[in-house]
């Protein structure tokens, strides 16, 4: 039986409001990034951040050539964090790794007020850039969308994230073209597809693929700068090769079964399951996420053997975990 446990609420405190930027970076520095990993946030059995495991994950990314990390994004379960947790994790990442990798904090919100406040604090603790989603659920007009993004673009380098499958609203190209007038727009993380990516690159707008299964073709056939990747949590070296090594359909085909497996259920369910089976994080899930069923866990172990254990993060033998091995945390 999967265990459901409560957690102690962490005693985090937001930094004081500040307009002094600790780690000023130009948008051009962000535009140059080819491999950005949407980093996983691991947990202790009581639901608090497992910072030791987190540091190991980031170090493995640095060691395998990732150039940036998204902190507290969809993959990092920012939607399950308080803002206090959010900012403390960004600050921790900057303090420990900011000299070795670009730290991009997900400080977006469907509330413009919250997005402004979180972004101020993210830059105050030293993040190099902000990631911003368009307002979701309480959707606005296109004019409202432009006003929302302009409110945060003034603060520093910004990546705009378009994923209508999650937000319920596409950011159309003319909105991005309007926002491109801002010197702080580093680019767009685009999940609509490669035709949209080509449209932006033709307009001189930097764009990263947000889809691991399309990123090879996006990079080498449609002009994408690189990828914001989930799969690189597992195989950072191979994803770097995919982004830096030129056209490589053989490697792309080798990775597609793993990528398909990762997104069989909504992200980050597959990734959380995989990292636990690799032994690099504890098998702890913050609800409402739960592990993949046992047949998919077996499938992952087989994929690791087919691709080669040496290409995956960590050095433990991949395991097929039982239901009893997992902790589900509902209060933290």
From Swiss-Prot:
It is an enzyme of class 4 (lyase). Pathway: Amino-acid biosynthesis; L-lysine biosynthesis via DAP pathway; (S)-tetrahydrodipicolinate from L-aspartate: step 3/4. Keywords: Amino-acid biosynthesis, Chloroplast, Diaminopimelate biosynthesis, Lyase, Lysine biosynthesis, Plastid, Schiff base, Transit peptide. The record marks 74, 137 as: Part of a proton relay during catalysis. Pyruvate binds at residues 75, 228. It catalyses: L-aspartate 4-semialdehyde + pyruvate = (2S,4S)-4-hydroxy-2,3,4,5-tetrahydrodipicolinate + H2O + H(+). InterPro entries: Aldolase_TIM (IPR013785), DapA (IPR005263), DapA-like (IPR002220), Schiff_base-form_aldolases_AS (IPR020625), Schiff_base-form_aldolases_CS (IPR020624). The active site is at 161 (proton donor/acceptor), 189 (schiff-base intermediate with substrate). It is found in: Plastid, Chloroplast. One of its GO terms (cellular component) is chloroplast. GO terms for molecular function: 4-hydroxy-tetrahydrodipicolinate synthase activity. One of its GO terms (biological process) is diaminopimelate biosynthetic process. PANTHER family: 4-HYDROXY-TETRAHYDRODIPICOLINATE SYNTHASE 1, CHLOROPLASTIC (PTHR12128:SF15), DIHYDRODIPICOLINATE SYNTHASE (PTHR12128). Catalyzes the condensation of (S)-aspartate-beta-semialdehyde [(S)-ASA] and pyruvate to 4-hydroxy-tetrahydrodipicolinate (HTPA). NCBIfam families: dapA. Belongs to the DapA family. This is 4-hydroxy-tetrahydrodipicolinate synthase, chloroplastic. The gene is DHPS1.
